[in-house]
Amino acid sequence: MSTAAIPGAPLPVRTPGSRARGRHRRPERPEIPAGSPALLLAVPAAAGPESRPVVEELLSIVRSEQNGVRTAAGYLPSGDGGASGERTVAELLTEAAEAGLPAPVVVPLVPGPHDFLPELHRLAAEYGAPVTDALGPHPLLAEGVHVRLSEAGLARADRARLFAIATAADGVVLTTVGGQAAADAAGITGMLLAARLAVPVVAAALDLPGSVADAVAHLKEMGAQNPALAPLVIGPEADAELLATAAEESGCPSAAPLGAYQAVGQLLASTYLAALPAVAPEAGADESDADEADGTRAGGRHAAQ
């Protein structure tokens, strides 16, 4: 029996099937050059029972997506004197420098602008470590939010399935943290989500007073009768109380945060790969010289024959 026949079962979001073999096969994953820097996931929270499982699962996805990558998670200082056993970004950067390793590529675990980014950039600059952009806006984030809405019964799994869901929302407030800058950036992901859902989507900041309420009111002015909240939040970057308070004060149902969604891990891996330094010109020149020498020797052998 399919899940569509089970009342209350979440509908799976349709994803593209595997590509055909031969010339249409899926491109191979790029290999990580030897000696490449590690991926340092910068978590905007202290290590704890809420943040640690999400972070560990995401890093597991990254390693499964890209064999050979070295990963580590750096948290904010927790004030427990290191009792949690988890290290901070500063400690990991210091360890890499003292060991003579390349400065790791720092990937912030946030979907958009966040208050902890300026300090992170300052800290990384002290060690010469590159910091990537935030993960969003990106279509994979819109996909993840769509999945969470579907799991909560607040959206169709895809537009091709036209049967009705009694609790489906007719408008969505895409909530995030990071103030107005984060809400503005989330608007782009909101446009991608609106195209998937075929309902209006308005972005709002959970940490900006009145932002969510204004977004809900705007949707109702547009004719929405059953608006819902959809967190553009991975998890560690937002206080759980902000999410609960927004749902309670707005009177709107809410989907779950993105959490350790598979596509978020894939996005982390691709963000890291894009930031890897290019092969050193000297190494490339040496390889070219070696290839040219091999070709010259081969040509000489053919001439002798």
Can you say where each PLM-predicted feature lies in the sequence?
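Active-site-proximal alpha-helix that buttresses catalytic centers in soluble enzyme cores
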Residues: 1-305
